[in-house]
């Protein structure tokens, strides 16, 4: 008896060749347009400019309160100049922020309260935007959201600064042992800054949305942001060096429009990274059907009900939204409004797995069919997702007999494989 040949997994080249690049680009473009992320980036840019001083004040207060971290502050400022902001405006912006932050202590209670409100407004805008991208319907309590972000604001610069201090210390020690730093070691040290930004973005995408986000998906988004940030910084620096339009027109005030452009570009990249992270599971599963034709939601509702009807006799009694999206070959966020409509009709209900902590992986509810198709009229579904009754279409309702049809008559056909 011949043994079956072992299955060889496809190589990474074959996976890249078979990857649905066109559908992926179409999905990401549609999500960016529907969520109006360009407008959101503009709003975040304006709020960020107002919140820069409060955030920088908090960081300086932390370093001032603990003189042991003075080295951390110096290295962190150097990293901001060399890595995060284009060199054309980095030193001027950092100088202005330091000057403004030092004067913030002279504000009264009213002025300081306005700064705090501005910082909190930026926090809530980021939180709301990311949760909208993940289609989260229930946000965390306000106090919990502010606490999470405030911890990130205060501890984030400290942790990042300590890592940069450690890397600079190792680099200094290495230079003392050898005349020139090996290229491989230099590449490792240069990669630390890149990975620090990627890790920060991965943490943002993993912890902020009030839903389960896998770490590997968050890291893909973080690496996407870190790569695009580096490319955008070099592109903007090259443009400003080649075409000094802003310096010629605005003179000494050129820093402000350049800073606004850079912040806007940065937020566009961060929001795109969130879209990549949120839609990566669907992209990897292979989205083959796109919305657009008439009656799309009604068609999805019928197929969802067909699958849930089949699962009534199974031990699970239902399906997760991700399972439904995989079987329907659609983006799970496209069927979310359909599931909400079926829930409003009390045709579909959700069951949460017992003993699972909220926010952890596995918290996705299972959808189950609650009605008996033999005794459930079809008219409510048609009215909600396809054709509302009116005097103009009343003859159609009467001739087709829609008012007298039951759900069972629509579920007789088997769903597509």
Curated annotation (Swiss-Prot):
Transmembrane segments: 49-69, 106-126, 146-166, 187-207, 235-255, 256-276
CC terms in the record's Gene Ontology section: plasma membrane
Positions of disulphide bridges: none
Record localization: Cell inner membrane
Alphabetical UniProt keywords: Cell inner membrane, Cell membrane, Membrane, Transmembrane, Transmembrane helix
Pfam family, one: Virul_fac_BrkB
InterPro entries assigned to the protein according to its UniProt record, in alphabetical order: UPF0761_bac (IPR023679), Virul_fac_BrkB (IPR017039)
Topological category with respect to the lipid bilayer: Multi-pass membrane protein
NCBIfam families in the record: yihY_not_rbn
Family: Belongs to the UPF0761 family.
Protein known as: UPF0761 membrane protein Daci_4966
